[in-house]
Design a protein with these regions (language model features):
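N-terminal hydrophobic/helix-forming segments and targeting peptides
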Residues: 1-167
């Protein structure tokens, strides 16, 4: 297994609809003549070996992510679309329109600011936000964060040689 290639592809930013970086990493690892279409599908024809089977490798390039839909007055970005319990305390990358990346952490109302009823209620996606360290909508916009920007969890490839397990 080529662990460096696995690391490059794993660490590439690629939420659904924004797979360009992952597709470029895959294409760079393939022989000359590979092609990429407008939908970021990567094609790499290989000459069949005489008498050998031909195999088609078909895989998704995208990862689960979010799309910025709005920014609150205090610069936070509301999230939606995931199972609530998988989201808290994650670091995310938000890709700006100009291609830059802004790190943000998922945040929700701290327990010491919650009422007793709020502390007892199940976590809801409406209460989870991305905090990029700004204090206003204007500051978020100045960083390049705006509706339509994709966001995905920040990942770092890791490999456990003892178990052969890669993350």
């Amino acid at each position: 297994m080529d662990l460096k290639l696995c690391e490059t592809i794993t660490n590439a930013f690629g939420p659904s609809g924004f797979e360009n970086e992952v597709a470029a990493a895959v294409q760079a690892a393939l022989p000359a003549g590979s092609q990429r279409d407008a939908m970021q599908n990567v094609y790499a024809p290989f000459a069949p070996l005489s008498g050998k089977s031909v195999v088609l490798l078909d895989a998704h390039l995208d990862e689960v992510g979010f799309m910025v839909q709005s920014i609150t007055a205090n610069g936070l970005v509301p999230l939606g679309g995931w199972v609530e319990h998988n989201v808290p305390a994650h670091i995310f990358q938000i890709r700006t329109r100009k291609g830059g990346m802004v790190r943000a952490v998922t945040a929700s109302k701290p327990p010491h600011f919650m009422s007793a009823a709020e502390r007892q209620a199940p976590l809801s996606m409406d209460s989870i936000l991305l905090d990029a360290g700004v204090s206003s909508r204007e500051q978020a916009l100045a960083l390049g964060i705006e509706p339509g920007c994709p966001a995905a969890p920040e990942v770092a490839f890791s490999y456990n040689e003892a178990t052969g397990f890669a993350l």
